[in-house]
Curated annotation (Swiss-Prot):
This is one of the proteins that bind and probably mediate the attachment of the 5S RNA into the large ribosomal subunit, where it forms part of the central protuberance. In the 70S ribosome it contacts protein S13 of the 30S subunit (bridge B1b), connecting the 2 subunits; this bridge is implicated in subunit movement. Contacts the P site tRNA; the 5S rRNA and some of its associated proteins might help stabilize positioning of ribosome-bound tRNAs. Keywords: Ribonucleoprotein, Ribosomal protein, RNA-binding, rRNA-binding, tRNA-binding. Belongs to the universal ribosomal protein uL5 family. The keyword RNA-binding applies. It comes from Wolbachia sp. subsp. Drosophila simulans (strain wRi). Part of the 50S ribosomal subunit; part of the 5S rRNA/L5/L18/L25 subcomplex. Contacts the 5S rRNA and the P site tRNA. Forms a bridge to the 30S subunit in the 70S ribosome. PANTHER family: 60S RIBOSOMAL PROTEIN L11-RELATED (PTHR11994). HAMAP family: Ribosomal_uL5_B (MF_01333_B). This is Large ribosomal subunit protein uL5.
């Protein structure tokens, strides 16, 4: 649905709004990166299995484990230890995930009022976090041992934050300012 919405109406409206000479100049979604930090995995090697399974269910794609670049004694992390997992979504899976995120997960999120414009990075990319991964319907609350958060980065081809915000507003992203 999001892909058709983008192709049918958003491209035309953004082209007119920003006076692009060509539809290839219109900003589009490039990829969505989802990251889940798992601090428990530094001491318990089996602690990463549950977040990997959860991220697989949420994204529909096999996630990769992420490893510590250097040792940090304060966090009891050694270089090369597993510290999280990530997945990068593109094309159809990206649009399916964003649709489930906006219409299902975000309304179920506690104390969610919308996104801020300050969450843009200055280059047209948008980043935010979710406190509870159980907001997604794919996760069975009875089968998980710990509620975890996740970071979501939306990378666009937009040159400025203004263009990226208009693209995300057209895709029904809830902004409060």
């Amino acid at each position: 649905m999001f892909k058709e919405l983008y192709k049918d109406s958003i491209v035309k409206s953004l082209k007119d709004k920003f006076n692009y000479g060509n539809i290839m100049q219109v900003p589009k979604l490039v990829k969505v990166c989802i990251n889940m930090g798992v601090g428990d995995a530094a001491t318990d090697s089996k602690a990463i299995n549950e977040p990997l399974d959860s991220l697989y269910l949420i994204a529909g794609q096999k996630p990769l484990s992420t490893f510590a670049k250097k040792s940090i004694s304060g966090f009891k992390i050694r270089k090369g230890a597993t510290v999280g997992c990530k997945v990068t979504l593109r094309r159809d899976k990206m649009y399916e995930f964003l649709e489930r995120l906006i219409y299902i997960a975000l309304p179920r999120e506690k104390d969610f009022r919308g996104f801020s414009v300050k969450q843009f990075d200055g280059n047209g990319n948008f980043s935010f976090g979710i406190k509870e991964h159980i907001s997604f319907l794919e996760i069975d609350y009875d089968k998980i041992s710990k509620i975890r958060g996740m970071d979501i980065n939306i990378i666009t081809s937009a040159v400025s934050d203004k263009e990226a915000k208009e693209l995300l507003l057209a895709l029904k992203f809830p902004f409060f300012d």
